[in-house]
Amino acid sequence: MSQRGGNDLLLEGVRRLGAVAIFLVQLLLESVPALSRPRLLVHQIYNAGARSLIIIMLSGLFVGMVLGLQAFNLLQRFGSEEALGTAAALGLLKELSPVITALLFAGRAGTALTSEIGLMRATDQLTAMEIMAVDPLRHVAAPRFLGGVVAMPLLTAIFSLIGLYGAQLIGVQLMGVDKGVFWSQMQGSVGLRDVTEGMVKSVVFGIACSLIAVHEGYHAEPTAAGVGLATTRTVVASSVITLLLDYVLTAAFL
Amino acid sequence: MVVDVRGLHYAVGGRPIFAGLDVQVRRGRITAIMGPSGTGKTTLLKLITAQIPADRGEVSVFGEDLAALGRRGIYALRKRLGMLFQNGALLTDLDVFENVAFPVREHTDLPEALIYKLVLTKLQAVGLRGAAGLMPGELSGGMARRVALARAIVMDPELLIYDEPFVGLDPISLGVILRLIKHMNEALGITSIVVSHDVHQLATIAHDSYLLSGGRVAAAGPPAQLRARRASDSAAVRQFMTGSEDGPVAFHYPAPDYAAQLFAAEE
């Protein structure tokens, strides 16, 4: 009995994964014509990106400050405080910035996307578009997906920048690490490959989080409870997938 | 014939909604689809607009069998019809003007000056030219439905479908909507399908009417005729036309014996 229950669960999982994969292919196909409407796309980049700026910048500053404090404390035990710049940069660029940005994106922009599309479904707006011979996948889903994919690497870069400033603020201004050493160590030991790793991660997270948010909204049950459930699923699924993909990508880059 | 439904069968989760339905909508006329709640009136609209496929039978619109049309064909066909949703279904991130302009921008390359004039003309027709700058959230229910009507006619459709256009309107808005439906039909020659359970309002505008019951057409003909020949009709038709509580459609949902259930709770 439990064996059968397990099989059903597995089948359901595979079925859902398949549905999301098909949806991704449809989105990518519709993304090409969506690119010909830059106004819609720019609006969505603004929605997903610019409107997340404050939370990303604030979080970046605090994460950088904590990183500066912890790393300084750890490095001091081995007498190598001058490596603080390198530690902060590598930690931020390769791991913390892409992962935390993706988690914040899921909570801020992802939920907004899901609930907006879900409510459009619940209030017949998507059906109305279909009756007007306008494909909602092309007009609603694809620009929002692309907007998220473009916004994520930009937000990640901003997070890294502010995070480094935060680490410098604590390490150099408060703890007294030499400013020149802080920046020159960083410059000497952080390579393009490290930056690329973070950027590749942010693009992959951007695709995953935007896909989940748009998919959940587009297929939400058209009720208040249905939209609420879809929004919750967006946050949970995006967070878990982000952390899983982070491991896979980190292993791939080693 | 604009819409021709023949021998339509449709079931949801094994429960039959339509079992051999026949409905014909003639060009240039207002056809009313009536019936108590849950008889599948809205489902019929979904079938006519190709949102869902029929299980069996044929649905033809403008002489084309919907089952034989691909996605492109269905979209091409939809460009020839307009639909007014119960709640208006206006796009909430666009203002009134942009809502009405939406189908024009999507399907044509008209210059901005022409779109401006076209949209204002349609808004003037529904009496809301002055509300062009408002957002959908700022409109009353009746106004939202009129904007949706302007949007539905902006591409000059041959067929207009109204889904429960009278629900929840005050007497003034109701009068306005009734007048507009009649006007669209008479002045523009648009064939109209009006789905509603409001027998009295429909009787004032519809040329033909169908009363659905039990998945089939229970009665058909001009609304006045339907009301007049009550005596010869089935109990279901009589109950619907007179709004009686007693009849085949029971007031009480099936339940165990009332007294037995009350006393069982005490024990």
Place the predicted regions along the sequence by residue.
Chain A
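Active-site cofactor/substrate anionic-group-binding motifs, chiefly glycine-
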Residues: 44, 48-100, 104
